[in-house]
Amino acid sequence: MKAGILGVGRYIPEKVLTNHDLEKMVETSDEWIRTRTGIEERRIAADDVFSSHMAVAAAKNALEQAEVAAEDLDMILVATVTPDQSFPTVSCMIQEQLGAKKACAMDISAACAGFMYGVVTGKQFIESGTYKHVLVVGVEKLSSITDWEDRNTAVLFGDGAGAAVVGPVSDDRGILSFELGADGTGGQHLYLNEKRHTIMNGREVFKFAVRQMGESCVNVIEKAGLSKEDVDFLIPHQANIRIMEAARERLELPVEKMSKTVHKYGNTSAASIPISLVEELEAGKIKDGDVVVMVGFGGGLTWGAIAIRWGR
């Protein structure tokens, strides 16, 4: 049995925070932010909207597209570093709200690589014959762990959710290969401090991301028995346009073959890849039979990538 993605969905908060808005909050400029990150604006969830609310909205869209009923879900995996609370988990909260009574549920904490960890975990359960339908959600309310007085990090992050239903597909479609990894020795470069603010050593994270994203892209292509010429589209974690471009150049892809949503939404951590996937499908940039590479990196340090032949 082969596992693939049956349907996707997303939730984007209404409130827009532009670079010009940030100019009034910290010592920065629109030009500085755009030049270094590619970000022009980001979305911020309302005070009374939490990760579970965004996750449910994205999940409902994904289930509808997949034509899978919530009661037919066997497992719910939520990738997040911003749960509503320590426990119960976001996955259990959305299990109740969706009415997915038979699904087991757990959260995954792998920061910006979390969605990749979730998809690969779901794949393993499906291809082993244990489960048939797994809901994977990447959701973050990063505005709740951002120091809005720190000019280095306040400009980066946004809120949102993306979801995918992973299930059985035909043998010539689905996930072709994957890579997951971690390097705990780099944990001090990106972490949450005692004030619940995100602390980042930008230089070290940048070096790690450029190297690892490129390597992971090449690795999953080789594991799938493919070459760079076989790749139709790249969806990198939307952290920084310079990091994204480095991954694209490693695959020798033209600009139009890489997803770019960072300018609209900023870095939404675990939500960025599924949000981008929805956008590119809606734009008609990914077609049945296309080979798509998705790759992310995050705090931990963690990374993950998959190569998938799109379709059912």
From Swiss-Prot:
It is found in: Cytoplasm. Pfam families: ACP_syn_III, ACP_syn_III_C. The lineage of its organism: Bacteria, Bacillati, Bacillota, Bacilli, Bacillales. Catalyzes the condensation reaction of fatty acid synthesis by the addition to an acyl acceptor of two carbons from malonyl-ACP. Catalyzes the first condensation reaction which initiates fatty acid synthesis and may therefore play a role in governing the total rate of fatty acid production. Possesses both acetoacetyl-ACP synthase and acetyl transacylase activities. Has some substrate specificity for branched chain acyl-CoA, determining the biosynthesis of branched-chain of fatty acids instead of straight-chain. Pathway: Lipid metabolism; fatty acid biosynthesis. It catalyses: (2S)-2-methylbutanoyl-CoA + malonyl-[ACP] + H(+) = (4S)-4-methyl-3-oxohexanoyl-[ACP] + CO2 + CoA; 2-methylpropanoyl-CoA + malonyl-[ACP] + H(+) = 4-methyl-3-oxopentanoyl-[ACP] + CO2 + CoA; 3-methylbutanoyl-CoA + malonyl-[ACP] + H(+) = 5-methyl-3-oxohexanoyl-[ACP] + CO2 + CoA; malonyl-[ACP] + acetyl-CoA + H(+) = 3-oxobutanoyl-[ACP] + CO2 + CoA. The last Arg residue of the ACP-binding site is essential for the weak association between ACP/AcpP and FabH. The gene is fabHA. It comes from the Bacteria. One of its GO terms (biological process) is fatty acid biosynthetic process. Keywords: Acyltransferase, Cytoplasm, Fatty acid biosynthesis, Fatty acid metabolism, Lipid biosynthesis, Lipid metabolism, Multifunctional enzyme, Transferase. This is Beta-ketoacyl-[acyl-carrier-protein] synthase III 1. Induction: Down-regulated by FapR.
